[in-house]
């Protein structure tokens, strides 16, 4: 039955190959179940509930992808979007996480509408490639900076903003070991390199006492109720969070389209330059985001790590089905996840204008290497920016540099859109920009100019 439904013979594959592909994809993306509880935990959400939610919603959305689109693609909470949710919307904008979940839900509804009514092509085409690439690079730089800080490799400094951390301390050495392991394995093209790096750091942490022994390996999954159905949609609408909702939507749309096209090209699924069943694939992602908000999680995207499964022969949704099954199984290993994603409180004394001030901060030596590596992989998009055209290069540069400097993805996108529209107009090339660019530039200017909107 599965052979016929997923058309294994027509796609030149088998149950064994699809199973191997599904396991490979899981190994390459399993780091999200360790990282997501830490990121959303920083926003005040229950880490155990986030862990269970991550496993459940990933399995749900990936099953949708398998049956709706028959693609070997896994869908999970997006790296980058989770940091926008926690560090920008909740911690910087001071919006309660329940309201932020409401914004995620609304962005998912917008995504469902565009996927259902065929508006995605116009929206994707409206944003120039240089800005799309710069957004990915900027998010990558921000994630890398946070990863470096979590590792203790760099630390905040009142005089220079950031400075080098204590590289001889145990937590930093554990982080460097995990980072070095991951980098070497990626260079050697080993599948699951990020996951292996996390596990190496965890084992080293156990031996050095940095990581606490969990006591057990298996347990009943933590309850999802502390975060499930806690979203506040009404307040998200009242608080004028249109910019936040649209940014969630755009990030989701761009990431998903980019990942699907990249994976489809590798798998040979493109036909005459087009992706068959693209609407169904986007709908699976969009429904996943709606479900994610309901379960207490962030926007969902098609994971580019699915390309690892494609590389070993995955061609159909059966591979995605296997990946989904692995995330369900992972729920029962919560003691291991809690051990790995736990933070370590560190105290230090810093000099501020001649005064000695003690401060406490939290390091995540086991999971931080994953952020640094994922961030570095996102920066590869910088090669797609046209650096020879100043009207393309400057907006792209402002986009990618403002994000890490302000810890704000929103401000980076705003600077990029405003400067892009301005430069195209003053150089007499206004027709090169889509009318949506000008609309968003005006909205972003109003956001800064009108009190209460920023």
Annotate each language-model stretch with its function.
Residues 1-49, 162-164, 196-279, 353-357, ...:
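Helix-loop-helix hairpins and the membrane-proximal interhelical loops
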Residues 1-7, 47-54, 74-86, 187-197, ...:
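Hydrophobic alpha-helical transmembrane segments
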Residues 2-36, 57-58, 78-87, 91-136, ...:
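Helix-loop-helix junctions within the multi-pass membrane cores of secondary transporters/permeases
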Residues 43-63:
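Loop-to-helix transition at the N-terminal end of transmembrane alpha-helices
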Residues 52, 102-105, 246, 283, ...:
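Internal alpha-helical transmembrane segments of multi-pass membrane proteins, especially GPCRs
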Residues 61-74, 183-189, 248-255, 285-295, ...:
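Transmembrane alpha-helix interface/packing and boundary motifs in multi-pass membrane proteins
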Residues 72, 202, 206, 313:
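Conserved, well-structured core segments that form the ligand-binding/active-site neighborhood
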Residues 93-203, 207, 321-454:
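Membrane-embedded alpha-helical modules
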